[in-house]
A protein has these predicted regions:
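Conserved class I S-adenosyl-L-methionine
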Residues: 1-40, 148
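Short alpha-helix
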Residues: 163-178
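Short, glycine-/aromatic-enriched active-site segment of Class I SAM-dependent methyltransferases
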Residues: 145-162
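A short glycine-rich, Lys/Arg-flanked "PGG" loop and its adjoining helix->strand segment in the class I
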Residues: 124-136
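Class I SAM-dependent methyltransferase SAM/SAH-binding core
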Residues: 46, 52-97
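Conserved beta-strand signature within the Rossmann-like core of class I S-adenosyl-L-methionine
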Residues: 137-144
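A conserved beta-strand element that flanks and buttresses the S-adenosyl-L-methionine
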Residues: 110
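Short conserved loop adjoining the S-adenosyl-L-methionine
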Residues: 98-103
Length: 207
């Protein structure tokens, strides 16, 4: 089996401009606005897997003290190109490696369309890291795809990206094991219009 992380990151390294353009074209406002219902104004916010910087820039514009990470250096370059206000807010980091931040450093942590790229064991580790850097009582919000019809037997899509598709109940169990208290969750269709791709978004409170 090829290295799932190297293969996934390599796609984003090679296709960063096109991937960033796709992300920028998607109206994600319904998700971010729903998350905003539960988070404090102008808090410390970490976005893990910021991609094109779309959401990080949105939160920055709303007055949050934003830190945004991504595993692809080329995607970070696109984020800065598209959103120059993110200068000084971008950090190169790859899960499931420990996040380079202190315990309880953030009021809010988001990870949209990230954790499903991790192996089963590493997703658990990553959720533990999200919990660690969130202050007690803080909010963790993340989305994952629960179904992708075009994966090969090893979990790779035609672009070489690796996915693990758990169902909503399995992710909920991982949330509980990570010490997260449920606040809100919802399922949704794919905003890019891909047939058969389904998503679930969780908003949790760190216990």
């Amino acid at each position: 089996m090829k290295d799932p992380y190297r293969s996934t990151i390599n796609y984003y390294q090679l296709e960063a401009p096109a991937a960033a353009a796709t992300y920028e074209s998607v109206d994600f406002g319904g998700v971010t606005d729903r998350v905003l219902r539960y988070i404090p104004e102008r808090g410390r916010l970490l976005e893990v897997g910021c991609g094109s910087g779309r959401d990080a820039a949105y939160y920055l514009g709303r007055g949050f003290d934003v830190t945004a990470t991504d595993a692809s250096a080329h995607m970070l370059s696109q984020a800065f190109r598209l959103h120059p206000d993110l200068e000084g807010h971008l950090v190169h980091h790859q899960l499931p490696n420990p996040l380079p931040f202190a315990d309880g450093a953030f009021d809010v942590v988001t990870a949209m369309a990230v954790l499903m790229h991790l192996t089963a064991a590493d997703a658990e580790t990553a959720l533990g890291e999200l919990a660690r850097v969130t202050r007690p009582g803080g909010i963790v919000a993340y989305s994952v795809s629960t179904n992708r019809p075009n994966l090969d037997p090893e979990g790779f899509d035609p672009k070489g990206r690796y996915f693990v598709c758990r169902n909503e109940d399995e992710w909920s169990a991982l949330n509980s094991a990570s010490g997260f208290l449920p606040v809100d969750s919802w399922t949704s269709r794919d905003l890019n219009g891909r047939v058969g791709v389904q998503w679930v978004t969780f908003v949790c409170r760190r216990g």
